[in-house]
Amino acid sequence: MRYRYYCPERPPMPGAIPKKGLLETGDEMCWPDDVFCWGWCIYDRKLTDAEVAEYELIDGGQVDD
């Protein structure tokens, strides 16, 4: 399973997102649920609530393979 997270505060770059389980990033601006985001990242695991809060991410849910 893969999980998507959006980055509303800064682009997805080293130090701005968790490293563990990171599969892919995209730095295209997007607007999930009408919220401006600098990009997205996909993980092979669900991030903890603490990680989501610490890195100020938005949970985008499970990604269909």
Which residues are covered by each model-predicted region?
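Acidic, low-complexity, intrinsically disordered interaction modules
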Residues: C7-D65
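Short structural boundary motif marking the start of a folded domain
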Residues: M1-Y3
